[in-house]
Amino acid sequence: MYSVTKQIEFCYGHRLLDYDGVCRYPHGHNAVVEIEMRAESLDSRGMVVDFIDIKRAIKAWIDRELDHRMILRHDDPLAKVLQEMGEPVYVLDSNPTAERIAKLMFDVSREHGLPVSKVTLWETPSSWATYVG
């Protein structure tokens, strides 16, 4: 089994509803997402996936949808306020936890046809969540 991994950095803000810790308040992270791709064999170029292809697909999506945006739960009253102000917001069906954002990145990678096997999202250098498909 072969694997390659691409790291992408981005910034986002969020808060968690129905949560009694400090993360219930709006705050931000300098995140790092690590996307691992696997394949039993290499393509005609001798690669699992070209790093440039990952960058073109996933980094472009992150830059367009998540970077420097608030990521909020669909029923968060703050989402409506920010949207009415013309501020960029990305809305999830659930709380925007590191676990949910890792799963989102896994799904987006799959939608782009990449052979993703694992996504890890670091909120901080000492706190991360991983989704394995």
Predicted regions, residues:
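Charge-rich, low-complexity N-terminal segments
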Residues: 1-133
